Amino acid sequence: MTTATRLFFVLTFVGCFFAYQPAKAQKKINQFNENKKRTGVWKKYYSNQRIRYVGQFVNGKEVGTFKYYDISTSKHPVIIKEFSASSDSALVRYYTLDGQLRSKGTMVQRKRVGKWTYYFPNGQLFSEEFYVDGQLEGELKNYYINGQVLELTTYQNGMKNGVSKKFSDEGILIEEVYYLDDKLHGKGKYFELSGDLKEEGEYRYGKRYGKWEFYIGGKKVTKKEMKNATKYSKNGDTKDQEDDND
């Protein structure tokens, strides 16, 4: 056998070997073990052949990092889940299509637990929530983009229960109300942007109840006086509400 012939067979063998490797590796994708449970690397695709998700299973359980993609793009995953090897929990991050973090928190069997945080497009903190078994629990905090607190609301069993406060973007309290099972119930107070009390009264099961007090510049006024005062625009001209639909 000539040197040229030997070289031909060697190159042919090497080429076949490397050509075989991807095919061999491909066979290990989307496999089941002897117990008919998913094992190893799994990849799923949308009907347009874009990747839907990629991750790894061990005896049917997700482990490590799973990446989920939107049907419109494969540039950046819209969800990344970091699964624990020793429990059913996963650290979950949601992203915009261009890769900006939207929210993050922990899930256990697809239910939110513990602290979850949400973000403005510029990365600033927008909201903080706490969950127990998939339901809101404890104090929710929403923020303005300048970092000031916008809202503080107490939740129990997934519903508003207890005090709820709202603030201006300068930190001034403008609303303080109470809830019972998602309905306004109890004392209610509303304030001007100056911080002066504007009106106060009581709610019963979502409706105003009894006598409400009204204030202008900290001075108590009648409901009629309050209504007349609200007809004035900032420049002092009267404004008929009936003309607002023009």
Write out the residue ranges for each language-model feature.
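Bacterial Sec-dependent N-terminal signal peptides
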Residues: 1-29
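Glycine/tyrosine- and acidic-biased, solvent-exposed loop/turn segments at the edges of beta-strands
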Residues: 20-246
